[in-house]
């Protein structure tokens, strides 16, 4: 098990390098990593970093992508977190298997989608004490302090 740590980085480049190093450590320990994503400018910078620097250095087949939040808009909307991830990561790294991408369908009726995604998480993510447990959960922090 990887030791839990809180790290603070000076800029998005340093964060991208540090996050990538942590991901590589997890891939050294676990056969498969479940990664929960968020939207925002920091993840976008990380996805751009991965697209430019990590296409051939990360075993993308061993990572499953989920989302911790999504807006109730279709993926073509600029506010959609999956759409941003697709544009800045998935479209640039075709080695990421489509069946490893588990998006929230923001275009669907919210309550039904929340119930559907809950089932997805309970089936596709290992449970710890009955709760889906991710190896990495990326949380955004807005200017107003929201997560």
Predicted segments with their positions:
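N-terminal glycine-/serine-/threonine-rich phosphate-binding loop
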Residues: 1-35, 111
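Short active-site-proximal "capping" loops at secondary-structure junctions
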Residues: 40-44, 71-72
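Active-site catalytic pocket residues across diverse enzymes, especially alpha/beta-hydrolases
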Residues: 50-55, 93
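Ligand-binding beta-strand-loop-alpha-helix segment within the catalytic cores
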Residues: 1-3, 59-138
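Glycine-rich beta-strand-to-loop/alpha-helix junction loops that act as flexible
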Residues: 37-42, 139-143
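Short, conserved beta-strand segments within well-ordered enzyme catalytic domains
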Residues: 34-38, 64-67
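Anionic-ligand binding region
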Residues: 132-135, 143-147
């Amino acid at each position: 098990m990887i030791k839990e740590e809180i790290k603070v980085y000076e800029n998005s480049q340093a964060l991208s390098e540090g996050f990538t190093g942590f991901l590589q450590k997890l891939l050294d320990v676990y056969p498969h990593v479940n990664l929960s994503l968020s939207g925002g400018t920091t993840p976008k910078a990380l996805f751009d970093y991965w697209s430019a620097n990590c296409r051939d250095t990360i075993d993308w087949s061993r990572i499953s992508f989920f989302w911790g939040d999504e807006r109730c808009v279709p993926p073509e909307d600029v506010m959609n977190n999956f759409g941003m991830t697709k544009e800045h990561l998935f479209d640039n790294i075709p080695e990421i298997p489509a069946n490893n991408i588990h998006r929230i369908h923001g275009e669907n009726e919210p309550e039904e989608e929340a119930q559907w995604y809950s089932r997805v998480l309970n089936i596709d993510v290992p449970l710890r004490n009955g709760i889906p447990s991710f190896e990495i959960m990326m949380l955004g922090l807005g200017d107003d302090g929201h997560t």
